[in-house]
Amino acid sequence: GIERDADFASKRYVEREEVVDLLGVTSLRDLSPKSLPDHRDKLSETSYRRAQHIVNENQRVLDAAKILRQEGPESLGEILTASQASLRDDYDASAREIDLAIETALSQGAFGARIVGVGGSGSVYALINSDDLSLLQVSVDGAFSEHGFAAPSTYVVGPSRGALRH
């Protein structure tokens, strides 16, 4: 995986708490994507970008839940990809290998793709048709090789009703 500074997640936590204190809210959930710009002058550019990611991500989660109930998982692609762009641009939680894996997945027909894991550690998931799996694996492996990166590991997962306790 991608090596991250051990303090990455704790730094983002501190940044988030500073924004909460500066804005006088209990949580960034108290803000909406429409209300956040009203507070821009109270925050540094970096703090604003961090808050923007969190506030918009909260909205994306709500939108994703609605889409899953109404349309199905294939419709999540745009939200996943927007989430990744925000993680990369506003939260600084990406790396060239991650971007390459996502760009390659999208170019090979993935509905969407996003980094997952605490601290941006380098795991990416892509929402694809199962028929495209082999082509996607070959394409990502080839792109990594072409750029001098170690071959990534691939884990195939599928949808389920959720974790079950037996």
Q: What are the residue ranges of the model-derived segments?
A:
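Conserved phosphate/anionic-ligand binding catalytic regions in large, soluble enzymes, centered on
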Residues: R114-S123
